[in-house]
């Protein structure tokens, strides 16, 4: 193999072109200067040689590598794929029940009297007004005070609560009774015992808002009344408390 030669320089090519041009002129007939057609033909050949030389492209040295271009714009989204297969059936879960209870704020009230000394046998003894906050709650009521009943013959008295003028119906009235039977007229009928007692219970079904809670005294069914006394010589009180159901 022969070693590769160097590329021809521009000066060498120019020299070769001039020599070629000179040869063309020398090869032209001497009568060319006298014959216009021949002269014109020679000029055309010279121009062809010049055009051929001008059309030659010389390969220069390699240029500096260019910089990376800017990233292209995002392409068009592809079409949706084929739906996958159904997964395996999961295990049976457990049912959890959670109860969210509203926080409860205590709501209660007490009305008290130092000495009622109420000697009526029928009617309202005392009253206490209470503000009930919820409709789905219950009221716990308590009356505490001295009670007394006396009579010559068998008698019965009943102490009970009312709510806005009506006895409790959820579920039943709240009451307490005292029954007294001397047994015979010969026995002492002047027994006069005052004893601290209580009337207490829960009542449901009362709407929210103001509730007038009262303690009353009345008769028992099928029995005559006696001589009743409430709150003698001692403190009496009504306590009302709202409770969640």
Swiss-Prot record:
Region annotation Disordered: where it falls in the sequence: 64-87
Gene Ontology CC: collagen trimer; cytoplasm; extracellular matrix; extracellular space; neuron projection; sarcoplasm
Domain Collagen-like positions: 59-92
Subcellular location: Secreted, Extracellular space, Extracellular matrix
Segments passing through the bilayer: none
Domain of life: Eukaryota
Glycan-modified residues: 188
Keyword vocabulary terms for this entry: Collagen, Extracellular matrix, Glycoprotein, Secreted, Signal
Gene Ontology terms, MF aspect: frizzled binding; prostaglandin-endoperoxide synthase activity; Wnt-protein binding
Induction entry: Strongly induced in carotid arteries after injury (balloon catheter injury model). By various growth factor (BMP4, TGFB1) in NIH 3T3 cell line.
Statement: the UniProt record of this protein carries the keyword Repeat: no
Tissue-level expression: Expressed after injury in the carotid arteries (at protein level). Expressed in brain, lung, and after injury in fibroblasts of the adventitia and the neointima of the arteries.
Signal peptide positions on this chain: 1-32
Principal subcellular localization: secreted
KW Translocase (keyword) present: no
GO biological process, one term: cyclooxygenase pathway
Purpose of the protein: Its overexpression in smooth muscle cell lines increases their migratory ability and inhibits collagen type I expression. May act as a negative regulator of collagen matrix deposition.
Protein name: Collagen triple helix repeat-containing protein 1
Native species: Rattus norvegicus
